[in-house]
Amino acid sequence: MKAYKGTDKDMKCRGMQYVLGETAVYDGELSLCHAGLHACEQPIDVLNHYAPCESRYFEVEADGVSDERGSDDSKIVAKKMMLKAEIGIPGLVKAQVEYIKKQIGF
């Protein structure tokens, strides 16, 4: 599943070190907001979790995604996640426009 992820400036998130182009794997039980590898289906939602001045933003491929979803944004939790490309804020905005177009069938 295509999704979007924020990390800190060192490409870490909740103790997990990510490497561009490599697949991160979580071995435990998944729990949204508590355990697993997290990202957002809707690009702009990433800003709810990672402030622009201290973060990096990526397009990711998530596998082993739980059916669990939050009520306040499009956050997902997965067993495997690969950072495909660093896109920054301009990439998030562009991806958000494409996301909306897809949702409305444009």
Predicted regions and their residues:
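Short, glycine-biased loop/turn motifs at secondary-structure junctions and
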Residues: 1-106
